[in-house]
Regions:
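Helix-loop-helix
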Residues: 1-216
Length: 216
């Protein structure tokens, strides 16, 4: 990972810009899977009426409802976890970047924007009881909330609750992480929102074209 960051730094002239470029490259590589996952989420949204019918029909039998729901997914060729797969594929990059920021002396005391050290949290202002203000993590959390607002609702209530808790979990878990890692996650969330908006635009355009080709 350090070799790749050094290569990107030679291109951009900055480790901060190198991390941003790395995020863009990862997103471009994963774009086919992300686009497929977004399509799966839209298909899930179209299944909502059928899922509501099943939920009402089997409201007293949760086990049978779960079985019928999975059968519906299978018939419609929809994966309830399709949107999560690209995020899981990014974990190795995330872990490798964290390890590099934590252990590489080249990245210590390297500043970018307001962050004085990419290998340390981007602390701004005084601390209170040992807790300071880390803008990049707060921005990333806000972007995650926005992304959830723009995403189609999940059919499974338990999955929906987990996704609603994810920004809070990420905020607590990553609050003291290196600012270089927070920068990666922040840019990643921005690109995810842009990709989602593009997928929604492409889907509407495709649906409009399909409607125009239907015989009157």
């Amino acid at each position: 990972m350090l070799y790749l960051l050094n290569l990107l730094k030679d291109i951009t002239g900055s480790y901060g810009l190198a991390i941003i470029l790395l995020t863009v490259l990862v997103k471009l590589i994963l774009w086919p899977l992300i686009h497929k996952g977004n399509k799966s989420m839209r298909r899930m949204q179209r299944l909502q009426p059928k899922l509501k019918e099943l939920k009402e029909k089997y409201k007293d039998n949760q086990q049978e409802f779960s079985r019928q729901m999975m059968d519906l997914y299978r018939r419609e060729k929809v994966s309830p976890f399709g949107g999560c797969f690209p995020m899981l594929l990014q974990l190795p990059v995330f872990i490798a970047l964290y390890s590099t920021l934590d252990s590489s002396v080249e990245l210590r005391h390297v500043s970018f924007l307001w962050a004085q050290d990419l290998s340390r949290p981007d602390l701004i202002g005084p601390t209170f009881m040992g807790i300071g203000l880390h803008p990049l993590i707060l921005i990333s959390t806000g972007l995650m909330v926005l992304q959830q607002k723009l995403s189609p609702p999940m059919a499974d209530p338990s999955q929906q609750k987990i996704m609603m808790l994810m920004p809070v979990i990420m905020l607590v878990f990553f609050y003291s992480f290196p600012s270089g890692l927070a920068l990666y996650w922040c840019v990643n969330n921005i690109l995810s929102i842009l990709q989602m908006k593009y997928s929604q635009y492409a889907a509407k355009k495709e649906e409009l074209a399909l409607n125009n080709t239907k015989p009157a």
